[in-house]
């Protein structure tokens, strides 16, 4: 028996605008008993069919929409169509930017709620973040194999958000071969080694690709401090852009070793690069106190806010770290600063940077804005898909 969800009166407006989420408070009743991730029919209170989606009984987002087309079944062919649509956009980007690594599926923004797929050459790395994504895993794998016969598929669903969906964390091979320790991708002429199994996220921060390329124009003949460097992404582009000297700072020695390897495979001059194992907050205070200055500071920290109750603390963290960065910049220097916290909108982040300037006793001019790379598109009906924001700031 098909399970049907009926929305409360007046709670269908967002769905009619094609927003893909149905919250628990917006539901009037459920006819039938749905299993975790089961496909359900969604109706307005008056009985009008609106959408077909996946049921998440333990989440505040009680259902996520697969389709607004009543005649569209959620089967292998559905996933094949979505993959082909997504690949069409990425083909344009891959040719334009010389990409062998990119985000193929950006969840709701590509019409597949809770599903993220990053492609590193012939390795497809999946993060399944919702009950519906988990329930349709086999169909998704079948569709990937049909679209990419020579693919290897690896799951990196080792993220805490799955707990909210009633799911355990999972990793492992779904099809093909186990990824090697290093898969080398290329973007904008830069080679990058990716550890799919143990790296952050699915192995690399693909969403910052456009920002990395745009950073090149700020660094020629400059001294650069790359904070939270991970495997050296921004630092590699700084060397590409002609930086005089680049310090990559991170707490992970393994990440720094990979950053150095990345510099080597790109044949960059290692005498211009330094790889420093350090706590960035402590390092910035040391530089401030001993008078060390830089021409450019790149500030790309991890997500400080995972939930709304962490936002206040995150604001303090972002302000403190940007204040410290401003204090170690030469007059006329450039701060490239970013936030990947989706809960923090661009306006709030700009205010935090402005407040940091006041505390640092520096005059700051915002001269450029940054967003997530084009393979992380923003669907017009899903503003929550916008999460990465950044600024280039001239610090006087």
Swiss-Prot record:
A single Gene Ontology CC term:
cytoplasm
Instruction: List, alphabetically, the SMART domains matched.
Output: PUA
Superkingdom of the source species? Bacteria
Per the record, what are the reactions this protein catalyses? cytidine(1962) in 23S rRNA + S-adenosyl-L-methionine = 5-methylcytidine(1962) in 23S rRNA + S-adenosyl-L-homocysteine + H(+)
Q: Which GO terms describe its molecular function?
A: RNA binding; rRNA (cytosine) methyltransferase activity
PROSITE patterns for this protein: PUA
InterPro entries, per the entry: PUA, PUA-like_sf, PUA_sf, RLMI, RlmI-like_PUA, SAM-dep_methyl-trfase, SAM-dependent_MTases_sf
Residues annotated as coiled-coil are none
Query: Which CDD domains does this one have?
Result: AdoMet_MTases (cd02440), PUA_RlmI (cd21153), RlmI_M_like (cd11572)
Where located? Cytoplasm
Q: Which UniProt keywords apply?
A: Cytoplasm, Methyltransferase, RNA-binding, rRNA processing, S-adenosyl-L-methionine, Transferase
Per the UniProt entry, the Enzyme Commission number(s) are 2.1.1.191
Q: Looking at the keywords, is Electron transport present? A: no
Instruction: Write down a Pfam family by its short name.
Output: Methyltrans_SAM
Show where the PUA domain sits: 2-81
Per its UniProt record, what PANTHER family does this chain match? RIBOSOMAL RNA LARGE SUBUNIT METHYLTRANSFERASE (PTHR42873), S-ADENOSYLMETHIONINE-DEPENDENT METHYLTRANSFERASE DOMAIN-CONTAINING PROTEIN (PTHR42873:SF1)
Family listed: Belongs to the methyltransferase superfamily. RlmI family.
Its annotated function is as follows: Specifically methylates the cytosine at position 1962 (m5C1962) of 23S rRNA.
Protein name, entry field: Ribosomal RNA large subunit methyltransferase I
Please tell me the species this chain comes from.
Aliivibrio fischeri (strain ATCC 700601 / ES114) (Vibrio fischeri)
What taxonomic classification does the UniProt entry list for its organism?
Bacteria, Pseudomonadati, Pseudomonadota, Gammaproteobacteria, Vibrionales
């Amino acid at each position: 028996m098909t399970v049907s969800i009926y929305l409360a009166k007046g709670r269908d407006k967002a769905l009619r605008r094609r927003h893909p989420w149905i919250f628990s408070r917006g539901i009037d009743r459920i006819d039938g008993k749905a299993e975790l991730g089961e496909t359900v029919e969604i109706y307005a209170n008056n009985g009008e069919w609106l959408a077909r989606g996946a049921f998440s009984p333990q989440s505040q987002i009680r259902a996520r929409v697969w389709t607004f087309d009543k005649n569209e079944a959620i089967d292998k062919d559905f996933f094949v169509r979505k993959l082909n649509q997504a690949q069409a956009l990425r083909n344009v980007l891959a040719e334009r930017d010389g990409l062998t690594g990119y985000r193929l599926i950006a969840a709701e923004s590509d019409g597949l709620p809770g599903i993220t797929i990053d492609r590193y050459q012939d390795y497809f790395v999946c993060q399944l973040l919702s009950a519906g994504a988990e329930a349709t895993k086999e169909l998704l794998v079948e569709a990937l194999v049909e679209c990419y016969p020579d693919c290897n598929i690896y799951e990196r669903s080792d993220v805490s958000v799955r707990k909210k969906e009633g799911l355990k964390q999972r990793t492992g091979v779904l099809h093909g071969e186990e990824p090697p320790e290093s898969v080398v991708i290329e973007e904008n002429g830069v080679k990058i080694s990716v550890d799919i199994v143990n790296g952050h996220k699915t192995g690399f921060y693909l969403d910052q690709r456009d920002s990395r390329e745009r950073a090149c124009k700020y660094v020629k003949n400059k001294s650069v401090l790359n904070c939270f460097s991970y495997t050296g992404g921004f630092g590699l582009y700084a060397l590409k852009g002609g930086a005089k000297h680049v310090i990559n700072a991170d707490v992970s020695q393994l990440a720094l070793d990979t950053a150095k390897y990345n510099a080597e495979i790109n044949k960059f001059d290692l005498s211009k690069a330094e790889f420093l194992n350090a706590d960035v907050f402590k390092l910035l205070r040391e530089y401030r106190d001993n008078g060390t200055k830089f021409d450019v500071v790149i500030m790309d920290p991890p997500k400080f806010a995972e939930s709304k109750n962490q936002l206040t603390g995150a604001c303090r963290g972002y302000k403190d770290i940007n204040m410290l960065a401003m204090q170690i910049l030469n007059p006329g220097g450039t701060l490239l600063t970013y936030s990947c916290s989706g809960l923090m909108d661009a306006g709030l982040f700009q205010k935090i940077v402005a407040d940091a300037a006041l505390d640092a006793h520096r005059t700051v001019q915002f001269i450029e804005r940054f967003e997530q790379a084009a393979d992380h598109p923003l669907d017009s009906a899903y503003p929550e898909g916008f999460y990465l924001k950044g600024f280039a700031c001239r610090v006087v």
